[in-house]
From Swiss-Prot:
Biased composition (Polar residues): 177-192
Keyword Nucleus: yes
Low complexity: compositionally biased ranges: 265-290
GO biological process entries: negative regulation of transcription by RNA polymerase II; positive regulation of transcription elongation by RNA polymerase II; positive regulation of transcription initiation by RNA polymerase II; response to endoplasmic reticulum stress; RNA polymerase II preinitiation complex assembly
Family note: Belongs to the Mediator complex subunit 2 family.
One MF annotation (Gene Ontology) recorded for this entry: transcription coactivator activity
Region annotation Disordered: where it falls in the sequence: 112-231, 265-308
This protein's name: Mediator of RNA polymerase II transcription subunit 2
Pfam families membership: Med2
UniProt feature, compositional bias: Basic and acidic residues: 112-163
UniProt KW keywords: Activator, Nucleus, Transcription, Transcription regulation
Amino acid sequence: MSYKNRLTACFDDILKVSAEMMMQQQLKNVQLDPYMVNGFSAQQQNTLKEKIHMFHGILDDLENMLSKSTYYVDTLANLGKESKRQKELELEKQREQEEEEKKQKLLELERKKKEQEEEEEKKKKQKEEEEKRKKELEEQERKKKEQEEEEKRRRQQEQDGDKQQSMFDGLDFTNADLDTSQPGTSGQNDIKSPTMGAGPQTAGTDKPNTADGPDKTNPPIAAFGLGDSQSGGLYNDLNTMDLSMFSELDGGGFDASGFDTANTSNANATTNSVPNNNNPATNDSNMNNDPTAAINAFDGTAAGNNETLGQGEKLEFDQSNPSAMLGNDINMGDNGEDYLTLNDFNDLNIDWSAAGEGGDLDLNGFNI
């Protein structure tokens, strides 16, 4: 069933009236009735006229309706577009706001990070400054301690020097002389020592020698009026000795038995042994004063001054000029036959290039 509205109903009525009028016109033509002017009546014409007017009215209403509908649709479309545009604007604004918030957050984070870095840098600098100050304080303390220790050492050295000076000031070096008289003539050997006083010490008095050797309270250098600085200069040349040729001294292959010499006058075990020193037969007063005894024999020849002193004469030393005894006239190299020389080595006819057995002395260092 089709849907009918005013327009379709009016259109159906128009078609119906028009069909009746056409059928009346056909009947007129077929019957050929002279009294029938029109094929349809006036009522039918009026009905058809009304229907046509109604149809046109419906079309006008339909046009208005369609126009209004178009306007409404356009309005809805515009409203939709405006709403869409508003939504887009809102979304854009919201997006911009979110971006701005993100940017603010990033700026805040960067600011906080920068502040944190600055704070850390500040703390680091403070820590470095504290460490630097601490190190400076420690360095000052160390220097202060070193200065105090140095001052203490200096005061100790000054005190030691003052003690030594006071000790040496108490000694008498002006009257040290040596009595070279033979025991057969005068019967005594007078030795004036600064440590023993200016009085004579008789050699005839029996004084047993100890096992440790002679009395160490009488330094021989001080007896001749020599100080520490003067006596040290006598042996300074030993520091310049070249010992590179004795390369085996540091090893275990150095044979020291070849250097044993018969120093009977200086190292006679029989004469210098403790029993003989304590033996009355060898240490009695007659033995000590016997001019024929080798122990008490004294050579009165002064090699440095080229003088021969007789028995009973006294060799005096000038204490104001200690170097007079140790002048150029003293032959320090004449050591007698008890010392080996280069000629003694050459007389041995040793093949210096031949290598010995393992552990022996390497003779290549002694090539002459």
